[in-house]
Curated annotation (Swiss-Prot):
Compositional bias per record (Acidic residues), positions renumbered to this chain: 281-291, 301-316
Region span, Disordered: 44-76, 231-316
Name of the protein described by the UniProt record: Large ribosomal subunit protein uL4
Keyword hit for Iron: no
Biased composition (Low complexity): 255-270
InterPro entries: Ribosomal_uL4, Ribosomal_uL4-like, Ribosomal_uL4_dom_sf
Function: One of the primary rRNA binding proteins, this protein initially binds near the 5'-end of the 23S rRNA. It is important during the early stages of 50S assembly. It makes multiple contacts with different domains of the 23S rRNA in the assembled 50S subunit and ribosome.
Similarity annotation: Belongs to the universal ribosomal protein uL4 family.
Pfam families, per database record: Ribosomal_L4
One Gene Ontology term, aspect cellular component: ribosome
Source lineage: Bacteria, Bacillati, Cyanobacteriota, Cyanophyceae, Synechococcales
């Protein structure tokens, strides 16, 4: 934020005004001003320079002389670029030199240029009422009271251009009068002093002031807590089909008893009826060895082990 003095028509300091504009960064300020200045000066060119080629010059359709037999050099047209009044080779052609620049860049360049001249900026009170009738001598004397010497140039910026001010200033070659809507980078940088009225400065601050600058959105930091996920926004892997089955459930599934149909099939293969009560409710009853022999079945291994010593003693 910078401050500049405010002077009245008599050249007395009556206060100060603050000027705080959103400008370019120091490392890019010179480049943005260069782009704006180049665009303004290039677009001021008319581009009317134009020359005619040998095809556009009038005449030259007839061959001057025959090709052979005259001893002269071969010639096909009197409008050849080698001849007098002939066409021009690679001459200037009508063209447009307009350069484009983004609107935000142009505004940034204007704010930067004006803020850079704050040390040479003088705010003056509105003096339209003092020019009645408009006199050039009155404005020239006021410039001296404001501190603008006779050999120094000045740019006078007013809110609205009135006829009285224009008639009083137009005969002073070193002073240029522009309205607030005509402010440009070239005029701001090409003078020794910049004079602006109080009303024009207020409108300028309302249009370009720091309060009117767009707010910068805060970007969330990495340490900020993340928002809770809504219940209806399920993440992949949260569905019932995606949930993993615990190993204990697999083990219980493996330990479940077989179905009745499987029991019947197994009993049919072994040649015995299936037990409808299942394997857990079956009770094994010991059978008599004599009954097993009568049925043609072999005695169990335990019984064979008990009867084997008795048979050996009988043989002895």
């Amino acid at each position: 934020m910078a401050s500049c003095v405010v002077k009245n028509w008599q050249g007395e300091t009556v206060g100060s005004a603050e000027l705080s504009l959103k400008v370019a960064r120091p490392e890019t300020a010179a480049h943005i001003l260069y782009l704006a200045l180049r665009r303004q000066m290039t677009n001021a060119r008319q581009g009317n320079a134009h020359t005619k080629t040998r095809a556009e010059v009038r005449g030259g359709g007839r061959k001057p002389w025959k090709q052979k037999g005259t001893g002269r050099a071969r010639a096909g047209s009197i409008r050849s670029p080698l001849w007098r009044k002939g066409g021009v080779i690679f001459g200037p052609r009508k063209r447009e030199y307009n350069l484009a620049m983004n609107r935000k860049e142009r505004q940034l360049a204007l704010r930067t240029a004006l803020q850079s001249r704050v040390e040479d900026l003088i705010v003056v009170e509105d003096f339209q009422e003092q020019l009645n009738p408009p006199k050039t001598r009155a404005v020239a004397q006021a410039l001296l009271r404001w501190g603008v010497m006779e050999d120094q140039s000045a740019l006078l910026i007013v809110a609205e251009r009135s006829e009285a001010v224009e008639r009083a200033v137009r005969n002073i070659a070193r002073v240029k009068l522009i309205g607030l809507d005509q402010i440009n980078v070239f005029d701001l940088l090409n003078v020794d002093w910049v004079l602006i009225t109080v009303s024009a400065l207020e409108q300028l601050k309302a249009r370009w002031g720091s309060d009117a600058a767009p707010a910068v959105l805060e970007t969330p930091s990495e340490d900020a807590p993340q928002a809770d996920i809504a219940e209806d926004q399920a993440l992949p892997g949260d569905g019932p089909e995606d949930q993993a089955v615990p190993e204990s459930e697999h083990e219980e599934a493996e330990q479940t008893p077989a179905q009745p149909e499987a029991q019947e099939n197994q009993a049919a293969l072994q040649g015995r009826p299936a037990d409808p009560q299942g394997p857990e409710e079956q009770t094994e009853e010991p059978q008599d060895p004599a009954e097993e022999l009568a049925q043609g079945a072999e005695p169990s291994t335990v019984e064979e082990a008990e009867t084997a010593p008795a048979e050996e003693e009988s043989d002895d």
